[in-house]
Structure formats: C-alpha cells, structure tokens
From Swiss-Prot:
Listed name of the protein: Deoxyuridine 5'-triphosphate nucleotidohydrolase
Organism: Legionella pneumophila (strain Lens)
BP GO annotations: dUMP biosynthetic process; dUTP catabolic process
Listed cofactors: Mg(2+)
Statement: the UniProt record of this protein carries the keyword Heme: no
Keyword set includes Glycosyltransferase: no
Family recorded in the similarity comment: Belongs to the dUTPase family.
Amino acid sequence: MHQVIQLKILDSRIGDTISLPAYATDGSAGLDLRVCISEPMQVAPQQTVLLPTGIAIYIADPKLAAVILPRSGLGHKNGIVLGNLVGLIDSDYQGELKISCWNRSQEHFTVNPGDRIAQLVFIPVVQASFEVVNEFTESSRGEGGFGSSGRY
C-alpha cells in the first residue's frame, strides 16, 4: 500500500544538511526521523528532552494515523527511549513533529544535529462505536487477564 502524505518543512536545514524522513531499506516499516538542532546536545541520565524534527505532516485521511516509535538500537545499546513510550499522530494534527527523548541510562548521551532518533510508522485506524449491553456472550477466556492465558 502506498499513500501520499503532505509534509511541511519548518526549518531550512531540512533537505539541505538534515535529511528528510526516509526508509532505511526497502523492507523498513518506519521512516527515520532526524533531530533538527544547531549543535550537539547532552541528555543527562534520567533526563527527558523534547527534540524538534523541523517538519510537520498532515495525514488528512481519518482512516490513517502515525505512531512515533523508538529506534531499537538506541534503546538497547544506549538506554535512549521515548519519554511518552509511543507518540500518536492523529490525521488532523498539523504541528511540528517533536520527539520526547528519555535517557533511562546512568550515562550522559550526546544527540547530534541530524541524528536518527525515532521512527515514524503509518497505521490504519478503525473508529469504533459502543453498544451498551448488560451481559457479554461468554468467551472461553472470560474475565481472565494479566497472565491468565499462559506462563507470562
């Protein structure tokens, strides 16, 4: 599936010294988002910072949304994850994409201009409505939760 999404460049470095979001490989699910800052920034242990990307997107289609996800290598190797765990971009949002970056490690981490810091994945959306009922049709699972379906 291919969908065209409007992208607005908010900082003149985008497309010049800082690359536009791009898929790293043909099989990549997420577009790499880069940090749009002027100089290196230190993120102290346990600190959370909001990093600009220099871009805004407008999805427009209410059957589509985007999620900002962490890059697995940053989290595993450096303890750098998203401060909000997952960022949800609604179809009608038009502001700058910003990355909430949390250094959960015990070491300082340097973010450099143009670093790939997160990834943007587009996902289909189903807007549900509710039917209020007094009872559910019984399922084999019932009300079991929090580990009830297996060892973990």
